[in-house]
Amino acid sequence: MRREIGAVLVTSISFAGISPACAQCCDHILMMDDSYGDGWNGGSLQVLINGSPIGPFAATGSGSDTTFQVCNGDALELIYTPLDYENENSYMLFDQWGNIVFADGPTPATGSVYTGTGDCTQVPAPGTMPSAALPIDTSDCVLADNSLVPGTGIDPGCASYQGGDIWFALPVPSSGNVVVSTADTGGLNDTGIALWTGPDHFNLSPAGCDDDSGPGYFSLMLASELPLGDTLWIQAFGYGGGTGAFELCVTDPGTVTLESSELPIVMINTLGQTIVDDPKIDALMEIKYNGPGNLTYVTDPANVYNGHIGIEIRGASSAGYPQRPYGFETRDPLGANLNVSLLGMPSENDWVLLSNFNDRSLIRNQLASAIAEGMGQYAPRMHLCEVLIDSSYKGIYVFGEKIKRDNGRVDIATLTGSENSGDDLTGGYILTQNYWDANNSFESNYTPIDHPTFDVHFIYYYPQPDTITQPQRSYIAEYVDSLETALYSVDFADTSVGYRKHMDVKSFIDYFLVNEVSRNNDGFKKSVFFHKDKNSNGGKLKAGPVWDFDWAWKNIASCSIFEATDGSGWAHLINDCFTDNYSCGWYVRLLQDSTFNNELRCAYDDYRTNVLDTANLFAYIDSVGLLVQNAQARHFQKWPILGVSGPAPEVNACAITYAAELDTLKAWIAQRLDWLDANIPGVCSNAGMNGPEAVGSLSCFPNPSTGTFHFQGFVAGSGPLVFTIHDVAWREMDRIVLSPGQIAFDRTLVRSGTYFFTLNDGGHLLQKGKLVVL
């Protein structure tokens, strides 16, 4: 991780080789950095002492340093000569105490850039420099005051640092874990803290920086698995240069030992390597699970998986969380992909371990997937598990499926490099919206109708950017263009020539509802997926799968839409907020179609009787709470984030117990559903189900049913009787013709939900009713 010191980006602060002296002469260190890692490419820095050159010096590789002596009264001058790739070059000159004498770069100024006089007599006041850090330990809460502290100029990159930093130090405890926090004492009320580690104050490496993860605008930071034997330096300061008194506390959460769990246990052996974000490293993995209701012990044999994997850090912002998320693939001993079924999930080789560091409920991602699946959509299957990496406890993770084209996942046709014409070319494709570049995406020819200056991009997810052919790139871009042309046309609502010709409406309704019920901050701007099968398999663009809900189901201080504490706000209007990636904004146009609105309302009303029923959602949450009642204690000892906002800056005070966290989530959901009950647009008329109650003598049982209904009775009539079943969007699901008289028959529906049946005689409605499939 790179941190800014003054105007210079560095990966660490190194003063190796300095022997502090407070006499006539003292050591200075010149640290040179190259961000690309190939040295300064001809650039150089000359150092003159009393007019005599002692250089020139230049960075080699990613960086290098040199030490030289300066005496009291010496004339010191720096002269920089540029050459190629100057935007990669930076440097810093420090005195014996770590004070920055001069720093510049990237793209340093040229010529004579600094002149000064040597001074080896200045000794820093206590707390004003890493070399003069004040002592503190894990039993301490100390009163600090930075009112008279000038500041080091070492910018840690958060909390709008403008100096005024005061420094503390302590040995890294035997657990390797500390929690550092600030609190109110009636003085400074907005702080920042940065943590640094190293064997001494001449060799500091950044360990993180925090603005206001604590109560109010105070700071809280967890540092885990710090190098034993090192010293931890704490840099505390006021936001934006603020000064005053505050409390600083350091605690040791201890070491978590895992012996048994009600959850699956995942044990990863890195073979002495460090897991990085790319490429995957070869490692070994064991998965142990004795099934629901049984304890699984760390000492049990691996009964789910025992073999090779390739593993890497995954995610964007989440990759920087202390509890890192991982992506991995199961492999055979030779390193080839190995498809296996894990924890009841269909056989595949690509999997994820999602971090719960931003989700104290341990349920947000699972809940969203369960809802989407209950709506009949594919959503990644997920299981909670406890993870050990190299015998070190890492907490509760979400073990799940990576979004991928596969018959058991996103079930669309394969698309090979040789399929470039005809029906072959039409699918399957997976697109996503996320952080894009010119090589991995195409730009829409349209802009959101409510934000005409915004550019919209679609990333090639399958086939991947490095394998998709040019005809395939052109085809899917042209298909999206045809969809948008229809969507933004005058006849957009026409069922023959409008957007429905290109779009699978039900999938877009379901995607909308999952992300609006959860008011997902990311669901319409990034972590957005679409997929399309071949035309011979239907061929319309579908929304989904749903993904990434750790910023959902809560009130977030980012924009009025997500800050609302009364359950209100439309997440699909994310473009109205300051956003890091623009939404395509299609729902703004779709909601101008009264038919779409009516279908949306009918679907919502239907789901409120089953998958979105408040009692059902609460029961699901309670079931997870019961499952992890023991594991959560270990998780929150490892990651003491209860009562802490975390990466998503929450508006409300955070619950301080896990049980209270689940109650908070349930209260949020109830309030959100109340608002949606009153504000989902459209009218659900159920088409032919309106009108006076019809008279008929058919009885139906069981109802509700698990799928099969038995009808019987006597019906008089003059001609053939037509019995039909419709779903809530009034699509015909079943039709049979019956003869008048005594009737008995069975009908089966395979998908859970609400349905309606009608019995007609020559167009005259004899009977109607509702069917519920559990």
Identify the residue ranges that each predicted region occupies:
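Internal "kinase-insert"/substrate-recognition segments embedded within catalytic cores
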Residues: 268, 329-335, 346-356, 376-380, ...
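Conserved oxyanion/phosphate-binding beta-strand-loop segments in alpha/beta enzyme cores
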Residues: 301-357
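Bacterial N-terminal signal peptides
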Residues: 8-17
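Middle-to-C-terminal accessory/interaction subdomains
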Residues: 262-264, 274-275, 281, 315-317, ...
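Acidic, Ser/Thr/Pro-rich low-complexity intrinsically disordered segments
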Residues: 25-26, 31-51, 57-62, 71-74, ...
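Residue-level detector of functionally pivotal "anchor" positions at catalytic/ligand-binding pockets or at interdomain
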Residues: 121-129, 251-256, 678-701, 716
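C-terminal outer-membrane/trafficking sorting elements
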Residues: 19, 692-774
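Coil residues (strongly favoring Ser/Thr
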Residues: 66, 75, 138, 146, ...
